[in-house]
């Protein structure tokens, strides 16, 4: 039976589907450069660089001004509001620099967490008020996709059914509003890696969360072909004493996705969740070699796992431009190969690439 009140026109659906497919075509993934001022400050502090708007702009200019060949591995970049309106040293808006490289521009749309009363420190996400107006303005300003991060954690009686349902509905409402305004919604339900839970526990919780999210997306008439999913990989908690291989992570992850994510979704772009750069690449490669049906493109949407080596190479010094850009390009290409199951670990990664990037209760 045809839906009596269609949410989108055929033209809107076509545009959304084409944008989503462009982002994940041929092993391409997403650079998440949407860190808030505070989060970026924590990163700069580690390399002893002051957290000023100019220093944030300079580092992002290094990432965005790399050789045009970056478009072979990066299909989209998520920006923070500040960055969307910043310019490079020649006076060109960053968003135009990216578009000229054939990269799709995205924006962070959620406004952080708010406590869910009556739960064990669980949260829901703020930002739905005024979202339609913000999306409309961002579309005019050249943005083609959005991102909304909901956070769930594994702990005593967590995640509760209330937290799962509340966050699933917020994600679905956001996705619907995005699509009405011509933006592809990246749906990000993150099960945090904090805790000592094992792989099986994370898989169980991830399946419950994803099932609720896709039920909510269906209830809200979201056009799945015009969305992307940004989930956590299924991993053991950071404090778990048992260690798992990339192949075990891959099997648990693809099994969870296979049970919950419709084949209509064009791409699944994993978050790195505080893994080292190298671990994030190895796990993604194993996922794309997993001997289970994989009807979606399985790619990456990494922040720390694409930037850590580059940030360490930069150190706040303009003279380190070449080394910074080479470090970023190397990680981007490695993840593009992993998104096609073709990455070969050479063992020649620098210290920054193998260092854990985990931060407890991580917030953007």
Curated annotation (Swiss-Prot):
Pathway(s) of this molecule: Carbohydrate degradation; glycolysis; D-glyceraldehyde 3-phosphate and glycerone phosphate from D-glucose: step 4/4; Carbohydrate biosynthesis; gluconeogenesis; Carbohydrate metabolism; fructose metabolism
Modified residues (N-acetylalanine): 2
Enzyme Commission number, as recorded: 4.1.2.13
Alphabetized CDD domains for the sequence: FBP_aldolase_I_a (cd00948)
PTM sites of type Phosphothreonine: 39, 119
Any one GO BP annotation for this protein: glycolytic process through fructose-1-phosphate
Enzyme active site: 188 (proton acceptor), 230 (schiff-base intermediate with dihydroxyacetone-p)
GO molecular function, one term: fructose-1-phosphate aldolase activity
Gene3D superfamilies: Aldolase class I
Subcellular localization: Cytoplasm, Cytosol; Cytoplasm, Cytoskeleton, Microtubule organizing center, Centrosome, Centriolar satellite
Function: Catalyzes the aldol cleavage of fructose 1,6-biphosphate to form two triosephosphates dihydroxyacetone phosphate and D-glyceraldehyde 3-phosphate in glycolysis as well as the reverse stereospecific aldol addition reaction in gluconeogenesis. In fructolysis, metabolizes fructose 1-phosphate derived from the phosphorylation of dietary fructose by fructokinase into dihydroxyacetone phosphate and D-glyceraldehyde.
NCBIfam families reported for this sequence: FrucBisAld_I
Other noteworthy facts: In vertebrates, 3 forms of this ubiquitous glycolytic enzyme are found, aldolase A in muscle, aldolase B in liver and aldolase C in brain.
Name assigned to this protein: Fructose-bisphosphate aldolase B
Species whose genome carries this gene: Mus musculus (Mouse)
């Amino acid at each position: 039976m045809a839906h009596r009140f269609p949410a989108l026109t055929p033209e809107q659906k076509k545009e959304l589907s084409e944008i989503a497919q462009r982002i994940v075509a041929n092993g391409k993934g997403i650079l998440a450069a949407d860190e808030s001022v505070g989060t970026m400050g924590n990163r700069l502090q580690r390399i002893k660089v002051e957290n000023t708007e100019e220093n944030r702009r300079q580092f992002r200019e290094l990432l965005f001004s790399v050789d045009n060949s970056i478009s072979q591995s990066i299909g989209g970049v998520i920006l923070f509001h500040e960055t969307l309106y910043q310019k490079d040293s020649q006076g060109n808006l960053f968003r135009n620099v990216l578009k000229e490289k054939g990269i799709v521009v995205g924006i962070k749309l959620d406004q952080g967490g708010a406590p869910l009363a009556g739960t064990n420190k669980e949260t829901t996400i703020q930002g739905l008020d005024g979202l339609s107006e913000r999306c409309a303005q961002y579309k005019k300003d050249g943005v083609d996709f959005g991102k909304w991060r909901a956070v769930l954690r594994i702990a005593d009686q967590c995640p509760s059914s209330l937290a799962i349902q509340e966050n699933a509905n917020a994600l679905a409402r956001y996705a619907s509003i995005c699509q009405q305004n011509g933006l592809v919604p990246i749906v990000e339900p993150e099960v945090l890696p904090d805790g000592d839970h094992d792989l099986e526990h994370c898989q169980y919780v991830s399946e419950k969360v994803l099932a609720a999210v896709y039920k909510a997306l269906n209830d809200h008439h979201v056009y799945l072909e015009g969305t992307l999913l940004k989930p956590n990989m299924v991993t053991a908690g950071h404090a778990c004493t048992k260690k798992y291989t990339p192949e075990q992570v891959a099997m648990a992850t693809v099994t969870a996705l296979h049970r919950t994510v419709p084949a209509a979704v064009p791409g699944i772009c994993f978050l790195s969740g505080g893994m080292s750069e190298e671990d994030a690449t190895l796990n993604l490669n194993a996922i794309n070699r997993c001997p289970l049906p994989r009807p979606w493109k399985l790619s990456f949407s990494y922040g720390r796992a694409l930037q850590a080596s580059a940030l360490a190479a930069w150190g706040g010094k303009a003279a380190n431009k070449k080394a910074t850009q080479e470090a970023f390009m190397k990680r981007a290409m490695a993840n593009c190969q992993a998104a096609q199951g073709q990455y070969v670990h050479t063992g020649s990664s620098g210290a920054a690439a193998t260092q854990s990037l985990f931060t407890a209760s991580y917030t953007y």
